[in-house]
Amino acid sequence: MTLLRHLLTATALLGASVQAAQGVTGSPFGFASGTTGGGDATPAAPSDISQLKTWLSDSTPRVILIDKEFNFLGSEGKCTNCECCKPASNTCGSSGQNAVKQNGSDWCGSYPTLTCTYDNAGIEGLEVASNKSIVGVGSSGVLRGKGLRLVNGVSNIIIQNIHITELNPEFIWGGDAITLDGTNNVWIDHVKINLIGRQMFVAGYEASHSVTISNSEFDGETSWSATCDGHHYWTVLGYGHNDKITFANNYIHHTSGRSPKLEFNSFWHAYNNYWYNNTGHAFDVGKNTRALIEGNVMVQVDTPLLADSNPGAVFAVNTSDVSTCTSTLGRTCVPNTLISSGTLSGSDSSVISSWPSGESDVTVMAASKVASYVKANAGIGKLGNGSGSSSTVGAAATSAVAKRADSDDAPFVPAYSEAGPGASAVPTQPSWSWRTVTNGPAPTGAPSDSPSAPQGLGAPVQASNKHHHQGHGRGY
């Protein structure tokens, strides 16, 4: 028995050392196909948070190994007895989320003012320059107290196998885990995100082309919930104009909204994701966005698709329209499966007919395989289980339209045990940041979440309410 333990330990260490030597595992697929990150740069691990900051932001192509926890808590001091507010959504006191009052923003409006203490490091993420691979080693790669920020035209970045956590989870505006704004070729893979104050992932107003988010875990279990139910509301937000994003093989659980919320002339392909225990809404598709939703599984999701007063186009595949994809995509689409959930409907064929080129190496598996696959593969420390990349899932195709669906694409109802566990301002500059906010005009028609009045832009919307586009701003 002792020998067996030693063998298992040696095997694990060997796997970690092999990964450390090679850097990125697998190859990007979907819209991020062709992304190389730091390329063939020699993988290296920074010694401390100062060196990590430097390596992330310099102009040198790098493969940066995150081989331990980098703890940013306290590294930029704390804001003590600073001004916050209590939004109307917080009806549960210390179990809810109050909001940091940001300079230059009137998001707090007439909400009661409070004093609060929060960690400065979490408010804004680490700047990431072009041509970087950020790769966690084994299960050790943790960024605590600070996220990542990709803005101002950066490109060719891979983020793989890391855990981002503890960004002022008590506070709205406490920080975002991963921010994109004006990027190209970004692959986010095998990332775990939890205990975040604001968005787990956000794409800002500037277009983020050629992005894939895959095999990642969005863990919404929290002690500070904007919806007062232990579920995180601010999950995935796509606000970029003309974003092209593949969202595949992800595990989204214990959330209550924005899972995802999408706007503004973008294309999102969401396939083979597993949603579990969402007490509010999953998809919120607005203003000119086109969403292709196929081969997903939703279990205990109250509102799979939120009604919107200005909706975008949704093609959510069911058994009756799988053949609609054939003429344009060259394959049948794969039906979604919903268990103990609300309705996911949408059959706007313009999504299919207008689908852009550039999404490649896509294989959509049957819903019958999704729950077990995603639970085994999504998140940190699971690279050896299969990356979901073109090298492990399927042979390359010239585009998404050319790739055949999994042959076993009949709808599936799994056994239940398989389910698993105010108005504000907008940045007037391309560099999208919560700190650099002015009171300039917002882009035309920017939407807002609005539960029962009087709510500010960006407040959590209740599943039973429709959108009211009553303001403009950065209130994401």
UniProtKB/Swiss-Prot annotation:
<feature type="active site">
    <location>
        <position position="258"/>
    </location>
</feature>
<keyword id="KW-0456">Lyase</keyword>
<feature type="region of interest" description="Disordered">
    <location>
        <begin position="412"/>
        <end position="476"/>
    </location>
</feature>
<keyword id="KW-0961">Cell wall biogenesis/degradation</keyword>
<keyword id="KW-0325">Glycoprotein</keyword>
<feature type="compositionally biased region" description="Basic residues">
    <location>
        <begin position="465"/>
        <end position="476"/>
    </location>
</feature>
<dbReference type="InterPro" id="IPR012334">
    <property type="entry name" value="Pectin_lyas_fold"/>
</dbReference>
<dbReference type="InterPro" id="IPR011050">
    <property type="entry name" value="Pectin_lyase_fold/virulence"/>
</dbReference>
<dbReference type="GO" id="GO:0047490">
    <property type="term" value="F:pectin lyase activity"/>
</dbReference>
<dbReference type="InterPro" id="IPR002022">
    <property type="entry name" value="Pec_lyase"/>
</dbReference>
<comment type="similarity">
    <text>Belongs to the polysaccharide lyase 1 family.</text>
</comment>
<feature type="signal peptide">
    <location>
        <begin position="1"/>
        <end position="20"/>
    </location>
</feature>
<dbReference type="GO" id="GO:0005576">
    <property type="term" value="C:extracellular region"/>
</dbReference>
<feature type="glycosylation site" description="N-linked (GlcNAc...) asparagine">
    <location>
        <position position="318"/>
    </location>
</feature>
<keyword id="KW-0119">Carbohydrate metabolism</keyword>
<feature type="disulfide bond">
    <location>
        <begin position="84"/>
        <end position="108"/>
    </location>
</feature>
<dbReference type="InterPro" id="IPR045032">
    <property type="entry name" value="PEL"/>
</dbReference>
<keyword id="KW-0624">Polysaccharide degradation</keyword>
<dbReference type="Pfam" id="PF00544">
    <property type="entry name" value="Pectate_lyase_4"/>
</dbReference>
<keyword id="KW-1015">Disulfide bond</keyword>
<feature type="glycosylation site" description="N-linked (GlcNAc...) asparagine">
    <location>
        <position position="277"/>
    </location>
</feature>
<dbReference type="GO" id="GO:0030570">
    <property type="term" value="F:pectate lyase activity"/>
</dbReference>
<dbReference type="GO" id="GO:0071555">
    <property type="term" value="P:cell wall organization"/>
</dbReference>
<dbReference type="GO" id="GO:0045490">
    <property type="term" value="P:pectin catabolic process"/>
</dbReference>
<comment type="function">
    <text>Pectinolytic enzymes consist of four classes of enzymes: pectin lyase, polygalacturonase, pectin methylesterase and rhamnogalacturonase. Among pectinolytic enzymes, pectin lyase is the most important in depolymerization of pectin, since it cleaves internal glycosidic bonds of highly methylated pectins.</text>
</comment>
<keyword id="KW-0964">Secreted</keyword>
<feature type="glycosylation site" description="N-linked (GlcNAc...) asparagine">
    <location>
        <position position="385"/>
    </location>
</feature>
<feature type="glycosylation site" description="N-linked (GlcNAc...) asparagine">
    <location>
        <position position="103"/>
    </location>
</feature>
<feature type="disulfide bond">
    <location>
        <begin position="325"/>
        <end position="333"/>
    </location>
</feature>
<keyword id="KW-0732">Signal</keyword>
<feature type="compositionally biased region" description="Polar residues">
    <location>
        <begin position="426"/>
        <end position="453"/>
    </location>
</feature>
<protein>
    <recommendedName>
        <fullName>Probable pectin lyase F</fullName>
        <ecNumber>4.2.2.10</ecNumber>
    </recommendedName>
</protein>
<feature type="glycosylation site" description="N-linked (GlcNAc...) asparagine">
    <location>
        <position position="131"/>
    </location>
</feature>
